[in-house]
Amino acid sequence: LRLERFVKTILCYGDSLTWGYNPVGADRHAYEDRWPSVLQAGLGNAALVIAEGLNGRTTIFNDHAAGADRNGARILPTILMTHAPLDLAVIMLGSNDMKPWIAGHAQASKQGMQRLVDVIRGHDYPLDDEPPDILLVAPPALCETADPDFAAMFGPGIAQSRMLASIYADLADEIGCGFFDAGSVAKASPVDGVHLDAANTRAIRRGM
């Protein structure tokens, strides 16, 4: 790929599902298996795909148990300024909001996604650039797992996570964003109940 020939720039803003956390082995998926990388391969020089995934990132909530800033709204302006100009921002967040000490409710994630859209649309971009188009993506629902640590963190939020797709779809209609349900093509691995194996990670791009 020749960078000078890219036509569009796409920001993929997310958590460990975008970073590429591999539930099998608790390591990181190979570059070519992460869904932003698969998207890049499919688009070729038509677009530059920027993967901004951080393990544990929430929509708008603080996680004081984390070693880095997981609040997606607080860090977003810096990321927008770093990568401007942007043509499309793809936001897939909400899974970590389901932790009981974070929010634990799908409606909270809706408010969080609304705030992220407001940040993107209201940001003071350099060189008078226009805000990018926005695609809201609902992450695959959480599922049951025998892993005791992940079950304690995410088990209470399974039912709420199943509501994210319909809630995000309604929000996208209300505020004029695109919408995609990643759960329509990918399922969380029962190994930890949250993350995606390589095949399901790649499937997000194909569905999108």
Locations of regions flagged by a protein language model:
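Alpha-helical cap/lid subdomain in secreted, periplasmic
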Residues: 4-6, 45, 69-207
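Serine-esterase "nucleophile elbow" of acetyl-processing enzymes
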Residues: 2-54, 60, 65, 78-82, ...
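Short secondary-structure capping/turn micro-motifs that flank functional sites
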Residues: 56-58, 188-189
